[in-house]
Regions:
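A short coil-to-beta-strand element that immediately follows conserved catalytic motifs
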Residues: 28, 90-96
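Long, positively charged amphipathic alpha-helical accessory segments at protein N-termini or as interdomain linkers
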Residues: 21, 62-92, 102-243
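N-terminal lobe of the biotin/lipoate ligase/transferase fold
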Residues: 1-87, 149, 206-208
Length: 243
């Protein structure tokens, strides 16, 4: 696994996409302390907080469960990360298909895209900001280090190189490293889906943006049914996450 750590970068996602255009070997993880031009859903610019977690990960499709509908990758990975994040933030929940909420406030999100048999996912979390909804009420680098540790442990990557950056006050230089590949086995889509299905009711009162069909625009999630492949059903129309 190739690992890139940056003190500051325009976007972990665009950096990773550029690497894949050069036919880089998978898997690849890119993490940044600061991000100046992050990408949000539907190509919107991500408004970066004073302290946040920014990472992008590229995996080969062959490493994913066979029953995973790739169009629901954001929902799948969003839930996997949510389970780990709840160890520290139990009130977090996943709004369909890819937004992290704390109560009724959005504090982060996850987007996915496919490229050359790779699935690329980008994760952004607001840890602290006095203007934006966030996870913490004060600037705390140890919270960021703790969240990084959760992600690293979750992916089962070799922690030797990662441990060098967790003292975020003193470690300021960029880092490129190679470690052993992950030994993590991803759970089946059905396993993840049934867990999320039990919490889908939390979407009541919220809406989501869809980009196809006669209902193009915002639709109320409480008016929708959740299909087995992660899609929404509204009347006779079906909507996938497309994130």
């Amino acid at each position: 696994m190739r690992f890139y750590w940056f003190k500051e970068i325009p976007s972990t996602q665009t950096f990773l996409v550029d690497l894949l255009k050069q036919e880089a070997t998978l898997p690849i993880l890119v993490v940044a302390r600061n991000q100046t031009g992050g990408i949000g859903s539907r190509g919107n610019k991500w408004q970066s907080p004073k302290l946040g977690l920014y990472l992008s990960l590229a995996l080969h499709e062959s490493s994913l469960p066979r029953d995973l509908p790739l169009q629901s990758s954001a929902l799948y990975f969003g839930w996997l990360f949510l389970e780990r994040l709840r160890a520290q933030y139990p009130n977090l929940w996943l709004k369909w298909p890819n937004d992290y909420y704390k109560g009724d406030k959005k504090v982060g999100g996850l987007l996915t895209q496919s490229m050359r048999k790779a699935v690329i996912l980008g994760l952004g979390l607001n840890i602290f900001d006095d203007r934006l909804a966030c996870l913490c009420d004060q600037y705390d680098l140890q919270r960021l280090a703790s969240l990084l540790s959760v992600v690293i442990d979750f992916l089962s990557f070799d922690g030797i190189e990662f441990s060098r950056i967790l003292d975020l006050d003193s470690y300021t230089q960029d880092l490129v490293a190679t470690s052993r590949d992950s030994v993590f086995t991803f759970p089946s889509w059905q396993c993840v889906f049934h867990k999320y299905q039990q919490e889908f009711h939390k979407n009541r009162g919220f809406s989501t943006h869809v980009m196809e069909g006669t209902s193009r625009g915002y639709i109320r999630l409480e008016d929708c049914l959740l299909r087995e492949d992660g899609a929404l059903v509204l009347g006779d129309e079906v909507f996938y996450s497309r994130r």
